[in-house]
Amino acid sequence: VLHEREIVTLIGPNGAGKSTLIKVLLGIVHPNIGEIKTTKPLKFSYVPQKFNPSHSLPLRVKDLLALEKCDPVIKQEIIHDTGISKLENSKVQQLSGGERQRVLLARALLRQPDILVLDEPMQGLDIQSEAELYDYVRSLPAKYGCAVLTVSHDLQWVMQGTHRVVCLNKHICCSG
């Protein structure tokens, strides 16, 4: 169960089913058993663990953001809040890991999701970028009214940034 404005983190060893569960939630694959039940239709946004666009497809940050239609005022607020204002004319392929994560997070937020799914959002970030992203992600449920579902191996995030943890190992081992 995932509640509105809640941050839940999935943890577990490699092969535990974290990515599969995300794919089921996003509708990419169908579950072998069981089903996903919701009280209303939900809008998801997903930030992948890795995003490496081809160098043969020159894509600027503003072009990537333009793929998602959004109120211009909300768009500018998200661009400001994620700290990517100065990156809008940059090519996505040339961004650092932290910059790319912030751009992907901004794009996901432009959808105004009910549930924001972040797959290892801190991976590859320097300590400063990680701390800034932690703080920002913690603010998202209150600011945008969305639930946040993360996959993480970062125990600091699990202990400090999460309302609830779900431990997987081919099934839900525990939750709390």
Model-derived features: positions:
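Conserved ABC ATPase signature
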Residues: 91-95, 99
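Hydrophobic anchor residue at the start of the ABC signature
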Residues: 105
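H-loop/switch region of ABC-family ATPase nucleotide-binding domains
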Residues: 152-153
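Helix-to-loop junction immediately C-terminal to a conserved catalytic motif
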Residues: 26
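Catalytic Walker B motif of ABC-type/P-loop ATPase nucleotide-binding domains
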Residues: 116-120
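H-loop (His-switch) and adjacent beta-strand-loop-beta switch element
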Residues: 165-176
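Conserved ABC ATPase "signature" region
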Residues: 72-88
